[in-house]
Amino acid sequence: MMMMNYNFPYYQKLAEGVGCEKEVDFVSCYLSPEKFRLPEKMREVARRISERGKFRVINFKTKSELRKYAVKIGEAYNKTFVNNWEYYPLSEREIKFVIDQLIVNAVPKLYKIILYNDDVAGFLLGFPDISEALIRQKGHITPWGVVDFMLELNRTKWVSLNGAGVLPEYHGRGGNALMYYEMERTMIESKYKHAELTQVAETAVQM
């Protein structure tokens, strides 16, 4: 999955030179699995929320398990970002297309969904970062390049978290604490040495 595009520093001056103004910034945050630790208070909130039983986390072991929840994840994605500046809902056809593309190379253990009773309340989607392979292939897709991309999926030590959210109605009810708790667990328990939280709008203050 492609994450944030890279813009050279001089792009800003060029754009401003023809009268463009900044609308919103999207930021990327580096997280070190070795150093990223939630405050104990937030961990305690997450544990209590889990113990009450209304919120629960679904972990996946196989792609077939993931596919069963794929449509619900797509629907939750639409609802989660409804208040974001760039929000535009995906159609059913677009949801299916995105799901089909993602599941091909999905690492099930990097996908988590949070249920409230039986409804999807939030999700955390992680993707192995194959940027090094893209750099080696200079952006070209060749037969060898495809092999390199596939090998990089297992070789990379970087994971990109580009899909983390809790539906607005569950904010302030423990959903966010549970999501961050799962983010911490995912990074600690995985093989990855580096993590990046990508494409976060500066207006998304709840993050």
Q: Where are the regions a protein language model picked out?
A:
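Acyl-donor-binding surface of acyltransferase catalytic domains
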Residues: 1-61
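Conserved GNAT acetyl-CoA-binding A-motif
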Residues: 1-2, 158-159, 187-201
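Conserved beta-strand-loop-alpha-helix junction that forms the acyl-donor binding cleft
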Residues: 1-10, 32, 167-168, 197-207
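Short alpha-helical functional segments enriched in proximate histidine and acidic residues
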Residues: 18, 80, 186
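Short beta-strand segments
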Residues: 30, 113-115, 125, 196-199
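A conserved beta-strand-loop-helix scaffold within acyl/acetyltransferase catalytic domains
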Residues: 60, 65-166
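Low-complexity, glycine/alanine/valine/leucine- and proline-rich hydrophobic stretches
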Residues: 135-151, 178-187, 197, 201
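Conserved acetyl-CoA-binding loop-helix of GNAT-fold acetyltransferases
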Residues: 158, 162-167, 171-187
